[in-house]
Amino acid sequence: MTLFILTETSAGYALLKAKDKKLLKRDDLEKETQTAEGVSNLLKLKNFQKFDSATTALEEVASLVEGKVTPRLASLLESIKDEKKVSLAVADPKLGNAIGKLPGLSIQAIADSTTADLYRAIRAHLPTLIPGLLPTDMSTMALGLSHSLARHKLKFSPDKIDTMIVQAIALLDDLDKELNTYAMRVKEWYGWHFPEMAKILNDNMAYAKVVLKMGMRSNSDSADLSEILPEEIEGAVKAAANRSMGTDISNEDLENIQCLAEQVVGFAEYRQQLASYLTARMTAIAPNLTALVGELVGARLIAHAGSLVNLSKSPASTIQILGAEKALFRALKTKHDTPKYGLIYHASLIGQATGKNKGKMARVLAAKAAIGLRVDALAEWEKDADGNEPTEEERAALGMESRYYLEKKLAAMEGKPLKPRGVGIAPNGIPIEQPKKWDIKEARKHNPDADGLTGDEPAATENVSKKSKKDKKLVEEIKDEEMKDAPESEEEEEASEAEESEEEKPKKSKKKESKTSKGKDSDEAKIEELAEKAGLSVKRYLRKLERGEINFDEDGNPTAISKKELKKAKKEAKKAEKDAGKKRKRDEDEEPAESKSEKKKKKKSKA
């Protein structure tokens, strides 16, 4: 089988033919290819197709990087079409697969580790294999092609589109800070002239527009604010302007305030435009991530990771705590619990969870987001039969399904329905209330009639709600009547149940049991009498009798031992035990001493 070697250079395509068909199987291939003579003895040039210009060289190399066969390369391969049993050595496996799929060419592409040494030798001694090619020309052409290829990659790389998201979210955060600072400065500055307007208007944008439209507060009657404010608030602003307590300002002061107000209005309008641009970018680049966590949280995750591809390579555990690196390393250093969430904490699904469920939802949401990110970054969408590209809904189908699953899981964990999408959720799980509509309320007046009241007499202008609460009918509490015939103890209840169940027994057994029941009744009567004498209930009397806390006189009258007497008896018993223990120790200490003296006497007697 004839062996050909395809070599891609910065000057053009070179097709080399091996003089030995079993060149790749030789053991001494590395030794023979160390010199230019050895390489020229093993290989010879079959065909060389030169690039016409630098632009064509860039197009050819860019397509080769993607593993595509260009028409120029296909025409070069047609020169070996007539030869039988051809094998072609290729440096890139992707390119080898593409060449093997070409119609009309029965070429076996080889792209494995056996060709690495051969290609290394060809690159080192390429000028000797291609006549008319100088080493200096090769280096200059390679340098120019590498620069143009780098520019091409930076310009048209799909991975770099997410840089727009990174810059947009960073600018959005900066705009929020600047807008808040400028709006507060306008309120403080214009507040010297018209301080009441800051309490009426909560919206910074509306405040700045009113400053631009009205100017001095003396122009409030002639100024038309209907385009900016509703009728009620417009009337309140004009009424407050007529009775304002602010100081007068000069025209020069007003011009500077209005210039700052123009900046606030311009920044606010641009911020809205930037937010809509960011939403459109996120739905186009990462639709599944946007469906799961929202465009703002998704954009912050991408910006923190650096790019969409870097974020898609991260596992779910990293996505979960992304943005909480300081807390993580602090916890690892101090051997405390690691954080459960980072930037993902601001997602609406986690915001609606409460307590321990926040950590669970963060873990599940990060797992689903990791899957959606890999689809967004690495999936290749093909056109349908009609040639139409997939819609945004089709691309975001996985994210929508995952969100539906997470919403069901969260509702099951929380045991309550979720808030609709679009509702702002605070970190504590409560929806963020929008600023309420400003209403004019009458000031509370002093009630002179209430000054002369004495005691708990109500005021003349008391609220109706308070009266209604006081006028509620009281519910009478009926005390439970004590049943005279009811059994006082569990024993009596059992006896009564036994009597009811045993009515069906024969008469003889009834007579016997009636005697025993009479005996029991007489004993219970005696116990009740003794309990009354002791001044205790029957239950307490029985308990104390079991503990031995009741003494009987000579006449048989019981007396309960008090708590003080019990404490004294216990203390005396403890002292007696301690004294007995000390005596035992003394006896034990004396016994060995006596045994020693006896041993000494025995020794003396033996001697």
Swiss-Prot record:
It comes from the Eukaryota. It comes from Coccidioides immitis (strain RS) (Valley fever fungus). This is Nucleolar protein 58. Residues 488-503 have a biased composition (Acidic residues). Residues 473-487, 514-532 have a biased composition (Basic and acidic residues). One of its GO terms (molecular function) is snoRNA binding. Required for pre-18S rRNA processing. May bind microtubules. GO terms for biological process: rRNA processing. Pfam families: Nop (PF01798), NOP5NT (PF08156). Belongs to the NOP5/NOP56 family.
